[in-house]
């Protein structure tokens, strides 16, 4: 009965859709037709509608990343109080700001950066200077150049006062276009009779006279002391011997001639090389290395010339010192041979320059022995004071920072000042902080082998210098009877100018 009354009750058939009250059901309400977006999505990809029924609203959007080529909008819940809003963040809008997005991983470079320790140190950029001070000032080069110019002006003035002309024209013309050799001797050129007893002077059987500094003829009217100048030297007397005491002892003629020059051609060529190649080398290796090689090469050259050149030949000029600097350029080329773009071209240019200089050394007033001696000393000292070859530094794991350790070089001026503050050791003569224990610790066998080469070069030049000095003062004349021809041309009697006695 109950079941029959239920199925046969007032509701014999279910109510129609139209008979249902839709206003009271908040979950089954028919949503109004969504209104179109005010702008197309393709034209405004970041447009966000406030209407939740907008198909472009973020409430109903999960755009396909793979199919959408446009910019991605910010997904996720916009209204935190809307329980039906999606909260799945896909991608933030414009994550790179104004920068470009990174390349795909397949297009990114795969090579690794080189080891910083094996690279040349980066020189920090400084504010560029204009004019004469654009580069680092080569103080030693400029001081030497100024001194040599002043001395040459004094030579010309003295020559003009003594002879009436600053340039020698009588009894013969000076091919270097400058003062006579007698004025140069009087001002300190290397002249063997003013430095020691020589055959044909101290052991002469009759009085020996020399040309005067003001001579314009071939006459000899002055004594040796008047020609040598300064405080004078003991004059030889007839019937003397090579053992006479006191003997001439103007040893400073091994040093002073570096500041004297025999003419405009001589000083012009030397200063051109000195102000270009010399200044560049000083900037590269530092003032104290440059000054050491310059002075040592010049002195060594005059010592060698005093032993083997003609004893009656006067010699002056800084050519020997410049040949020592040229030797440093040769070493620098050989050290970095594989790093040079055209090493053979540079070597050929250097060889040609050396050959031309030796040809000029055959002219009066110049000395090829000074050139040879200066070049030899430059090579030996270069091995001692310059950096190691690049190939050796790479094998023993040293960075290519040549001249920072003891300052004064091209890398030292750009060195980090904080690094100098933190280094330990003693500051010797302002040359930089040096820590012997840390310097020699952990060195490899190749490093020690190269330092043995350096030590051998230093010992060799010291022994050679001592032997040449002893030989110069021990033996009155050279044991090589033909060596003097290496420094003169047998024309116009040039080789006879050095003859004080018959050979």
UniProtKB/Swiss-Prot annotation:
Residue ranges, compositional bias (Polar residues): 1-11
GO molecular function, one term: serine-type endopeptidase activity
InterPro entries hit by this protein: Peptidase_S54_rhomboid-like (IPR002610), Peptidase_S54_rhomboid_dom (IPR022764), Rhomboid-like_sf (IPR035952)
Entry keywords, A to Z: Hydrolase, Membrane, Protease, Serine protease, Transmembrane, Transmembrane helix
Keyword Lipoprotein carried by entry: no
Topological domains, Cytoplasmic: 1-136, 275-283, 338-342, 387-449
Membrane-related topology note: Multi-pass membrane protein
Main subcellular location of this protein, as a coarse class: membrane
Subcellular localization: Membrane
One Gene Ontology term from the biological process aspect of the record: proteolysis
Residue stretches spanning the membrane: 137-157, 254-274, 284-304, 317-337, 343-363, 366-386, 450-470
Superkingdom to which the source organism belongs: Eukaryota
UniProt-listed Enzyme Commission number(s): 3.4.21.105
Keyword Transmembrane helix: yes
Catalytic activity entry: Cleaves type-1 transmembrane domains using a catalytic dyad composed of serine and histidine that are contributed by different transmembrane domains
GO cellular component, one term: membrane
Short name of one Pfam family: Rhomboid
Annotated spans, Disordered: 1-66
Residues forming the catalytic site: 319 (nucleophile), 371
Extracellular side: 158-253, 305-316, 364-365, 471-503
Similarity remark: Belongs to the peptidase S54 family.
Functional note: Probable rhomboid-type serine protease that catalyzes intramembrane proteolysis.
Protein name: Rhomboid-type serine protease 2
Taxonomic source organism: Emericella nidulans (strain FGSC A4 / ATCC 38163 / CBS 112.46 / NRRL 194 / M139) (Aspergillus nidulans)
């Amino acid at each position: 009965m109950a079941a029959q009354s239920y199925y046969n009750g007032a509701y014999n058939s279910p109510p129609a859709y139209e008979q249902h009250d839709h206003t009271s059901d908040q979950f089954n309400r028919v949503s109004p037709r969504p209104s179109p977006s005010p702008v197309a999505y393709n034209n405004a990809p970041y447009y966000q509608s406030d209407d939740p029924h907008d198909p472009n609203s973020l409430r109903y959007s999960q755009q396909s990343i793979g199919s959408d080529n446009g910019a991605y909008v910010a997904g996720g819940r916009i209204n935190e109080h809307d329980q039906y809003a999606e909260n799945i963040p896909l991608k933030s809008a414009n994550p790179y700001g104004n920068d470009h997005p990174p390349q795909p991983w397949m297009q990114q470079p795969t090579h690794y950066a080189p080891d910083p320790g094996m690279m040349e140190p980066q020189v920090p950029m400084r504010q560029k200077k204009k004019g004469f001070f654009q580069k680092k000032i080569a103080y030693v080069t400029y001081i030497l150049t100024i001194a040599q110019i002043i001395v040459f002006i004094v030579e010309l003035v003295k020559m003009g006062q003594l002879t009436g002309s600053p340039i020698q024209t009588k009894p013969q013309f000076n091919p270097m276009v400058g003062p006579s050799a007698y004025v140069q001797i009087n001002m300190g050129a290397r002249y063997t009779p003013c430095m020691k007893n020589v055959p044909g002077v101290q052991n002469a059987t009759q009085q020996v006279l020399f040309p005067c500094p003001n001579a314009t003829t071939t006459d000899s009217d002055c004594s040796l002391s008047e020609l040598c100048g300064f405080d004078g030297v003991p004059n030889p007397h007839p019937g003397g011997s090579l053992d006479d005491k006191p003997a001439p002892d103007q040893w400073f003629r091994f040093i002073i001639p570096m500041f004297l020059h025999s003419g405009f051609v001589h000083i012009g060529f030397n200063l051109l090389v000195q102000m270009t190649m010399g200044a560049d080398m000083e900037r590269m290796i530092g003032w104290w290395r440059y000054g050491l090689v310059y002075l040592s090469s010049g002195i060594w050259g005059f010592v060698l010339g005093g032993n083997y050149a003609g004893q009656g030949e006067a010699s002056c000029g800084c050519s020997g010192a410049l040949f020592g600097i040229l030797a440093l350029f040769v070493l620098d080329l050989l050290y970095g041979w594989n790093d040079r773009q055209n090493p053979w071209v540079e070597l050929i240019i250097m060889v040609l320059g050396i050959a031309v200089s030796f040809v000029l050394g055959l002219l009066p007033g110049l000395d090829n022995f000074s050139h040879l001696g200066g070049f030899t000393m430059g090579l030996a000292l270069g091995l001692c004071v310059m950096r190691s070859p690049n190939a050796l530094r790479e094998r023993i794991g040293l960075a290519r920072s040549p001249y920072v350790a003891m300052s004064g070089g091209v890398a030292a001026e750009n060195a980090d000042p904080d690094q100098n503050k933190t280094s330990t050791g003693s500051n010797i003569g302002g040359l930089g902080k040096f820590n012997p224990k840390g310097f020699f610790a952990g060195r490899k066998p190749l490093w020690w082998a190269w330092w043995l080469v350096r030590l051998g070069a230093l010992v060799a030049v010291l022994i050679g210098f001592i032997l040449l000095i002893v030989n110069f003062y021990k033996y009155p004349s050279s044991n090589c009877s033909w060596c003097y021809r290496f420094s003169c041309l047998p024309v116009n009697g040039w080789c006879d100018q050095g003859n004080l006695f018959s050979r």
